[in-house]
């Protein structure tokens, strides 16, 4: 594909990029053409394989957080990210509701045990930011616990990065109409129904 064709396909997606401080926002009002998407995905996945070799060779430790609204596409993005990777060096962590024992522990403790060793990539499908998100919204955490999280989270992440961990954080969002549409698709599709929780209905 020529550079001109590449630009044409990319422009067709009405791709918009805005920057606010350290935050980069991407907006797409149309879907990418399927062939263009698949071609680009193959290129990106090839680069991911190279990156994993580099991580192993250098001993880097990488943590990637995927956060966002329900049904925003976190799981699909993680699937495509990990498809080409060697599972020996890349793990996905998707923790459920804290157990009664975990509720008595330091809030970050259950995440610490999943942090990577040298040469590993760990992807969190939701993370410690649950405390400021779903736990806050659904009333699973007290106001005091949430306020303490706002103090502790930057300190915790600073400890990780100062120890040499490369921390990457991504937020996925969709509008209310698209979210409702995706919830309905999950209700109607038995193979996707497991993605629904009682809180989504």
Question: Over which residues does each language-model region extend?
Answer:
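Charged, amphipathic alpha-helical linker segments immediately N-terminal to NTP-binding catalytic cores
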Residues: 1-43
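Conserved nucleotide-sensing/catalytic segment adjacent to the nucleotide-binding pocket
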Residues: 33, 90-150
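Pre-Walker A adenine-sensing motif
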Residues: 46-56
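Conserved catalytic network of the ASCE P-loop NTPase/AAA+ motor domain
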Residues: 56-57, 85-87, 100-101, 113-117, ...
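Pre-Walker A (Motif I) flank of P-loop NTPase domains
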Residues: 58-64, 118-119
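Glycine-rich phosphate-binding P-loop
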Residues: 64-82
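Conserved nucleotide-binding/hydrolysis micro-motifs of P-loop NTPases
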Residues: 71, 98-101, 127-130, 173-180, ...
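A glycine- and Lys/Arg-enriched "phosphate-lid" helix/loop adjacent to the NTP-binding pocket
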Residues: 134-150, 160-201
